[in-house]
């Protein structure tokens, strides 16, 4: 019994080298960028929706379903991350997810039918969700997790701002395929982050008496996030179509975003 207890205690003890690695600037930066790559599809969803409507001739209803498929992929895989993100090798999953992100975006460039596009965008979302879950888990293990989360949001908004200045021109010049290839190029940068990523995170085992409070607060936080993104998601996907219906200048509209 004593031997078994010692093994469990040892397994629950975090390696000092792992703690040091997770708090390195290179690891923090890698985790931040990985989460940015994991949100690229959602950040630039209006450009994708506008492209499949104007270039592929999909109705707004079908385009909405395709956008929902991509967001569902992110939600399902990142949501299930509570079960797998502490149990699976981060580097392996990050490599597979990045390959899937690139491959699914590449497949999307040759698709003109609804169901293949629906499936490919769901796969993009699933890959994005895995990268997002790993990146956020790595950030949360840092000793300055709250501050790093703020830096990540700032980085995400900076990338979004630059993207909405540059990517509309890319789509106008090279079409929807050009936009998707831009996502592929950005996705390739995730491999750089993987180089600095630890294979696993810290052990998050906690005392039983604290679990009830954690479950309650987590449920409230998740509920609030759910309602926020439900309100935001439907409008966000069709943001470019609002510009189109109001006949605004695309350059000015995306610059304002």
Q: Where on the chain are the PLM-derived regions?
A:
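Helix-breaking motifs and short loop linkers at transmembrane-helix boundaries and internal kinks
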Residues: 57, 110-112
